Amino acid sequence: ASPFDQIAILGFAGFVFGGFVELEGFHHWPRRGLIIVAPMVGLIWVIARAGEFDLTIADRNFVVFIFVGVLIAGVRTSRGKGSGLTAPTLLVAAAGGLFVLSWINGNFDLAKISAVIGMSIGGFFAWNWPTYRYPPGAALVAGAATSLAAVAGILVLDGRVSGTSVAILGLIFFSDWLAGFVSFGGGQVGRAMRPLLVIAVAAGIVAVAATVSA
């Protein structure tokens, strides 16, 4: 299967799995655990099917780093604390980062896939900003995170993007924590500005990753 097919299959599987988690009404910790597992399984799938790639020791090391990054991403996006827009904001930023790295390194197919994933999550974000309406469900988080994990894995295995730059993108999932050092107050304006500040911090991280990759 092509990378596009793999990502589409994994994204759909993550979405369905997340929907199952949502419908079954798992309590907080089991729910988090299952959401965290989904993107990690997606990355394992990509690595297991990577026989067409010639993996060096450095590549294997970076795959381990990406695996750890995916674990961190799952932990950070499955939390119940904070704004309901936190997880979609981080996932949109991650998709944007993968788009930039793919594009500047000439992997336009993965860039397009990253853009589609980002715009899909961005639609949910736009519907919930500046007025928050609906919390992100497990289907959205698991589906998007699984797709992005697959993109990150394929990007590293393809060899056109340095593993270091992709690993740096993992810091995006701490953007909300870094943005927390700036306070806009607890009113409606403050709540509306927080996701934008998270995106601004994430954009800085993407810029660093792009510089390293160039």
Each language-model region and where it sits:
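C-terminal transmembrane helix-loop-helix hairpin of multi-pass membrane proteins
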Residues: A111-I117, F124-A214
